[in-house]
């Protein structure tokens, strides 16, 4: 997971993140503040995914940046 890319461009990415995962709230994204592991946890919580699935989703997202 390229968490450096996510952290470094967090403010620019929040719109794309909300497009991809619309169940995440502005508060979720503000609290995550670019931390991929927090984002993974929120995806698990909001979508009921396993940790592995949420990590893969974030990995796929960051690979497309």
Swiss-Prot record:
Organism lineage: Bacteria, Pseudomonadati, Pseudomonadota, Gammaproteobacteria, Pseudomonadales
Domain of life: Bacteria
Alphabetized InterPro entries for the sequence: CsbD, UPF0337_stress_rsp, YjbJ, YjbJ_sf
The family this protein is said to belong to: Belongs to the UPF0337 (CsbD) family.
Coiled coil: none
Protein name, per record: UPF0337 protein PA4738
């Amino acid at each position: 997971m390229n968490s450096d890319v996510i952290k470094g461009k967090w403010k620019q990415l929040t719109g794309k993140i909300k497009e991809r995962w619309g169940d995440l709230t502005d508060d979720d994204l503000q609290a995550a503040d670019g931390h991929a592991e927090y984002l993974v946890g929120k995806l698990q919580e909001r979508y009921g995914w396993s940790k592995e699935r949420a990590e893969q989703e974030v990995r796929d997202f960051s690979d497309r940046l």
